[in-house]
Regions:
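A common structural junction motif
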Residues: 85, 230-237, 278, 349-355, ...
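Buried hydrophobic packing segments
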Residues: 48, 119-129, 158, 271-275, ...
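An extended, acidic, His-containing surface patch that forms the Zn2+-binding/catalytic region
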Residues: 252-323, 329, 333-345, 357-452
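Active-site metal-coordination/substrate-binding segment of hydrolases
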Residues: 54, 77-144, 150, 161-163, ...
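Acidic-glycine-rich active-site phosphate/pyrophosphate-binding loop
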Residues: 87-102, 184-185, 189-191, 241-253, ...
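Midchain, well-structured core segments that form catalytic/ion-binding scaffolds
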Residues: 149, 155-335
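Acidic/His- and Gly-rich active-site-bordering loop/insert found
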Residues: 2-110, 134-136, 251
Length: 452
């Protein structure tokens, strides 16, 4: 039986174990003693380590921040870092997000692709490599994190208490290979004076705001003008109702990850735009449309920039109203040739006027490995050797992964280019056939990394 056939025979077992992980709601929760990210992530980590133990690996739980499964001997460590925490469910799911549902090659559930499925792909790659009798001149360590989606504090803890990795990868992006990740910058826009009674939408800051409900005072003819304006947009659904002197606007856009906001439709942005087109005079509506708007390039805040590896992107993820003030979270992905200080300087003059203000939050520098570095070459070779695909080259992405938190690793798979796995959206899925192929690719990758 060749290796591909061996992987196929283990496929049902791997999917069953994925079901065990998907069944756990591992969103960030309220910290408890010994559970820094809440009960859900801690339970997912315990289950992930239990699966690894059942497969014969030594495991270590690092205070429920993260843990790892390990094989081999030696001082050097080939590391693989995935995460078991998930983003909020949100959206209109066809399937139960916490019950693995299989339809043909598709397996649905929150975390199937981001990132519980890839963690198991790496784990089974380790198992098959170990069982094949390959000499392990280094340790191979699969780290399971619990806080990737909300700050990667799990990897901060790993760096404090565990050994540095010699090289490795994180299975939390795309094939064929990621040799750079854009920097990250967060902003929040606030209203000063507004007639908007309430405006709320979005679930997470790192995804396009795909639903929004807005309440404004009624004006003669405004409802009809809003409906006419909304009818010309790319919204999936909209609804305008008028009652008791108020107009309520519901808008449903299209979700997308903040690293590729151009693939989505911002429900809040459409609402702001349509309010202005309909003649609703409001200071913050003007501010939003001028500084944020429907463009994803950051031009409104003076940040339009593009290098050979990609353009700066801007995404409005959440809109909410508290104490009469509207706030809009903004997620910006910064090209790899820009530094955080450069970005701050570029936008300083565009952060406030009489209609609103924008505060700069967290800023993180980009990550970049030269295309011909040994690490990039080793991983890319594994991908090409298994798939035969030489058309797609290593790339730079807008997403951020554990590669920015751990030394000497880059993101590597398992998503295929051009595929939409509904990550951070409803009906997230993974393909069983792609899981099997990823196991084979990760086996080859580990072997290549053992040799450098």
């Amino acid at each position: 039986m060749n290796m591909k056939e061996q992987i196929h025979t283990l496929s049902e077992e791997m999917i069953a174990n994925l079901g065990r992980l998907v069944a756990i709601d591992s969103q960030l929760g309220t910290p408890e003693e010994g559970k820094p990210f809440g009960a859900g992530p801690a339970k997912a980590l315990e289950e992930g380590l239990k699966i690894a133990e059942e497969l014969g690996f030594k495991t270590v739980n690092l205070d429920h921040y993260c843990g790892y499964a390990e094989m081999g001997e030696g001082e050097e460590i080939v590391g693989i870092a995935g995460h078991l925490d998930i983003v909020p469910v949100g959206g209109d799911w066809t399937y139960d997000p916490f019950k693995l549902t299989r339809e043909g090659d598709h397996v649905y559930g929150r975390g199937t692709t981001d990132d519980k499925g890839p963690v198991l792909e790496a784990l089974y790659a380790m198992k098959l490599l170990r069982d094949s009798g390959v000499k392990l001149n280094k340790r191979v360590r699969l780290i399971m994190g619990c806080n990737e989606e909300t700050g990667s504090k799990c990897m901060e803890h790993y760096n404090e208490v565990a050994e540095e990795l010699s090289c490795g990868f994180t299975p939390d992006a795309n094939f064929p290979c990621i040799h750079g990740e854009k920097g990250h910058m967060s902003m929040t826009a606030y209203s000063k004076n507004t007639q908007i009674i309430s405006m709320n939408g979005g679930f997470v800051s790192n995804a396009v705001c795909d639903t929004c409900t807005t309440v404004i005072p009624t004006e003669t003819g405004l409802k009809e003008k809003l409906e006419a304006s909304l009818a010309e947009t790319k919204l999936q659904q909209y609804r305008v109702t008028e009652e008791n002197g108020q107009i309520t606007i519901f808008a449903k856009g299209v979700p997308a990850h903040a690293s590729m906001p151009e693939l989505g439709v911002n429900a809040a942005g459409v609402t702001f735009e349509c309010m202005e087109k309909a003649g609703f005079e409001d200071d913050f509506v003007k501010f939003y449309n001028e500084h944020i708007g429907m463009s994803c390039d950051g031009a409104g805040v003076g940040l339009k920039f593009e290098d050979e590896y990609g353009a700066l992107t801007l995404c409005n993820g959440i809109v909410k109203t508290e104490d009469g003030i509207i706030s809009c979270t903004i997620d910006i992905r910064v090209p790899v040739t820009l530094k955080a200080a450069d970005v701050r300087t570029m936008c300083e003059a565009r952060l406030e006027d009489e209609n609103g203000r924008i505060e700069i939050g967290e800023i993180g520098d980009p990550l970049f490995f030269p295309r011909e570095s040994p690490l990039v070459n080793a991983l890319y070779k594994a991908y090409v050797d298994v798939t035969g695909d030489t058309e797609h080259e290593p790339m730079v992405i807008g997403g951020g992964t554990y590669a920015k938190s751990l030394k000497n690793i880059i993101a590597f798979g398992p998503e295929k280019m051009g595929m939409d796995y509904h990550i951070h959206s409803a009906d997230e899925f993974i393909l069983v056939s792609e899981m099997e192929e990823a196991v084979l690719i990760y086996m080859e990758a580990i072997k290549n990394l053992l040799a450098i």
